[in-house]
């Protein structure tokens, strides 16, 4: 059930379930009462307020889980340094997003499901979970077939150890430092098509748990491989 809030005369709050409304009223509520940012800057301002003063953010924007992000194309650095953020945003519409680099950079407490996200338009996931130390959620269902950048994607994501073997990484060209000090990761990724990758330098540096066969990988395009398995 989707719980939404309505402010009455700027003072009183009432809460209703969206599913209980007639269809026509649902559309009106979605159009006028659910926060729908038009730009990254508008969304970033709302996120900052949410992380700094949740009560004020609730009054101004409603709950972050209900925001309509369907117009946003760039979510880079969105939760950068939001060290205490840990709210569910799995219902966000990210289908228009192309850039998610550094999205959860040092969001050290974040560990919420993201498996409902449609990331099929995203091309850049570089450093997406950089130092997102608590994150360990299933994302194997993601369509990453458009992604070209995964450099440092899980850098320092020390808790992450979920399967990602279903990912289509055939468009990725840069995996440098992808699992750098991702110290818990030990999932089979030997089936990946890495034939387009040119950079695998320090890819598993400090990934002390990783012990999976990758001998079937086609490394014919790789030009940078230094320190791939350095401790």
Labelled PLM ranges:
Residues 16-231:
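Negatively charged
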């Amino acid at each position: 059930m989707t719980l939404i809030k309505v402010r009455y005369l700027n003072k009183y709050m009432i809460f209703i379930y969206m599913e209980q409304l007639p269809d026509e009223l649902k559309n009106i509520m979605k159009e006028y009462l659910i926060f729908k940012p038009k730009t990254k800057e508008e969304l970033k301002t709302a996120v900052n307020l949410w992380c700094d003063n949740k009560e004020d953010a609730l009054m101004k924007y409603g709950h972050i889980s209900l925001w309509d992000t369907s117009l946003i194309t760039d979510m880079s650095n969105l939760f950068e340094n939001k060290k205490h953020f840990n709210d569910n945003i799995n219902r966000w519409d990210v289908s228009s997003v192309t850039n998610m680099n550094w999205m959860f950079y040092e969001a050290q407490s974040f560990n919420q499901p993201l498996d409902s996200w449609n990331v099929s338009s995203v091309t850049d996931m570089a450093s997406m979970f950089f130092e997102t130390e608590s994150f360990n959620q299933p994302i194997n269902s993601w369509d990453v077939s458009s992604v070209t950048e995964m450099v440092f994607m899980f850098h320092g994501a020390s808790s992450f150890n979920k399967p990602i073997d279903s990912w289509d990484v055939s468009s990725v060209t840069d995996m440098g430092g992808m699992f750098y000090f991702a110290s818990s990761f030990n999932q089979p990724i030997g089936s990946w098509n890495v034939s387009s990758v040119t950079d695998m330098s320090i890819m598993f540096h400090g990934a002390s748990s990783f012990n999976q066969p990758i001998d079937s990988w086609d490394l014919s395009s790789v030009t940078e491989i230094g320190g791939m398995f350095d401790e």
